[in-house]
Amino acid sequence: MARQEQQQHLQVLSALDAAKTQWYHFTAIVVAGMGFFTDAYDLFCISLVTKLLGRIYYTDLAKENPGSLPPNVAAAVNGVAFCGTLAGQLFFGWLGDKLGRKSVYGMTLLMMVICSIASGLSFSHTPTSVMATLCFFRFWLGFGIGGDYPLSATIMSEYANKKTRGAFIAAVFAMQGFGILAGGIVTLIISSAFRAGFPAPAYQDDRAGSTVRQADYVWRIILMLGAMPALLTYYWRMKMPETARYTALVAKNAKQAAADMSKVLQVEIQEEQDKLEQMVTRNSSSFGLFSRQFARRHGLHLVGTATTWFLLDIAFYSQNLFQKDIFTSINWIPKAKTMSALEEVFRIARAQTLIALCGTVPGYWFTVFLIDIVGRFAIQLLGFFMMTVFMLGLAVPYHHWTTKGNHIGFVVMYAFTFFFANFGPNSTTFIVPAEIFPARLRSTCHGISAAAGKAGAIIGSFGFLYAAQDPHKPDAGYKPGIGVRNSLFVLAGCNLLGFICTFLVPESKGKSLEEMSGEAEDDDDEVAAAGGGAAVRPQTA
């Protein structure tokens, strides 16, 4: 089978698989990665400013505590971008297979730039109108962000060589960690600058004066700055040629694929149009997504990539979105009434930046350095297992962690759950769908898997706003929930299910994309391929 694949393989694809790491690889990582930097910044920075939005637009000076967003508004502001992302992943994933990766790639970036700026310009003076406008633009921001998931992963996988493909895709995704970190740092800088320029007393000392008028600029500037990295990389994204695998295997233009990659790799590559036509004639397996052939060859794989991403994102996004409430519950952030509005923003940003620096960013880069050594399967299993362990380690002795003197231990344990999410399923669930499906369906299947993940993120962001409420003392406007401790038990259960579902996902380390997808096989080999899941399944002995 290996010899047959070698005979059928186009020279342009073999050249890409065997290429040494070159400058164009790093260029592709930066160009694609800046999209993820922007994605993470835009999606996570909203959790830093929700408390500020509540103070500005929903404070009742007759009440003892500063205002907070009503439950339905908080759920919408936190979760609406995820709804847009889910829709964008499905739409642009499908479009990337129909029109080509490059032609769709610029659309997503422009949407991110325009909607990031528009989010900060949300107009009107009534709270309802401002929040409605903000949610409208954040939905379309999420729609653009959604397209970046399948397109960036697919482009990087189709550009990369076989030996270090996992590290290259992981490096693109790792820019998400820097985006989260940047969101925290930018918020720290802006809140510090405004706090120094417009000092204000704590809410309990001066209810009206604790939120200065200029605080309304703070959240707008933070959201609008998300447009900058995307804008800076637009030109370079448009200069990238279409991937050779799309041009050759989907558009059936071997001449153009060879010409494009000859420039990129700086080597002479034969056109081999005749060979491509022979391959098309010999291998007519142009089955669609909803065909029996796809179900036999890749059905369980798609179920595996979708369910693991879904379960991971329930835990991952709920942690990020209610971490400010966790910090409050362990007294890492003082009670709101003891701070001014800008002081509260500063303290929330400082806490999130510390978690990103210690737990989030290192986990991504451990994946980059180790994924092509130990494989995707082992990293994903380890990640889900350790997340389960640390979640239980937080939940079982939760009352111990919340007593005086034990708060730092809680934060360390909490940081480890983020570390093993990123040195684990948060990275691998992004990588594997870009490697195991046929070129003509690769972007679509990645989009489906990613959309399943965002469905989990929606459950996490909407559901846990309510679930994490204290059963005895819920926040104003909320019904009693199951509390942070029981929420952590639920998240541990999600991680355990993710561990089990990982066994549906094949190992792709060291294999070509065509070997994983079965595109190098004849129709005569279809039966073998249909039962060949075991051939690419990880060895667990």
UniProtKB/Swiss-Prot annotation:
The keyword Transmembrane applies. Induction: In roots by phosphate starvation. Residues 514-541 are annotated as: Disordered. CDD domains: MFS_PhT. Residues 1-28, 96-102, 148-168, 237-297, 375-376, 426-447, 508-541 are cytoplasmic. InterPro entries: MFS_dom (IPR020846), MFS_sugar_transport-like (IPR005828), MFS_trans_sf (IPR036259), Phos_permease (IPR004738). It is found in: Membrane. Residues 50-74, 124-126, 190-215, 319-353, 398-404, 469-486 are extracellular. One of its GO terms (molecular function) is symporter activity. Belongs to the major facilitator superfamily. Phosphate:H(+) symporter (TC 2.A.1.9) family. Although related to the sugar transporter family, it does not transport sugars. This is Probable inorganic phosphate transporter 1-8. It comes from Oryza sativa subsp. japonica.
